[in-house]
């Protein structure tokens, strides 16, 4: 089972750093598709990802054309957008899946969504013209954990343990 997160033209380094941390801690592969609104060595990006960068499987692409050339669609690409009619929870995600997320200000390219209406999905939210979209890194986390939930959280630690400590009584 391989979970891939594809960020198309991300603009805000802190969001990308948060997504990198989510990917590192869930075993998801991160694909960054340019052009990006920041440099890879941006300190805000590194800070948001904390000290998890060594755990991350990350690949960079100059543009979508390069990404699609190196990663052909085998019916396993899902496009997260506010413009979709299908909910992200209505999909049965395959064992090798790619979740696409667009830039913070515009989302995914319209032509990509027009060409893939059956695999475009949305995360439900309020029907309010002032509420355009969820934060990008939050949307990625919601999508990633829905896939992992369906897969029964493979390789993830699902039970925690409190540390022993003495209570003041």
Can you name each region flagged by the protein language model?
Residues 1-169:
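Post-transcriptional modification and biogenesis factors for structured RNAs
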């Amino acid at each position: 089972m391989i979970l891939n997160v594809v960020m198309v033209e991300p603009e805000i380094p802190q969001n990308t750093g948060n997504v990198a941390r989510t990917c590192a801690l869930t075993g998801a592969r991160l694909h960054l598709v340019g052009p990006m609104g920041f440099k890879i060595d941006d300190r805000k990006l590194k800070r948001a990802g904390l000290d998890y960068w060594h755990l991350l499987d990350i690949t960079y692409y100059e543009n979508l054309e390069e990404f699609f050339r190196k990663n052909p669609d085998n019916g396993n690409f899902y496009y997260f957008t506010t413009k979709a009619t299908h909910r992200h929870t209505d999909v049965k995600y395959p064992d090798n899946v790619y979740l696409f997320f667009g830039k913070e200000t515009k989302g995914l390219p319209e032509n990509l969504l027009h060409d893939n209406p059956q695999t475009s999905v949305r995360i439900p939210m309020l029907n309010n013209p002032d509420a355009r979209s969820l934060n990008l890194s939050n949307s990625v986390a919601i999508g990633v954990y829905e896939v992992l939930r369906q897969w029964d959280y493979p390789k993830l630690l699902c039970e925690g343990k409190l540390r022993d400590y003495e209570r003041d009584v």
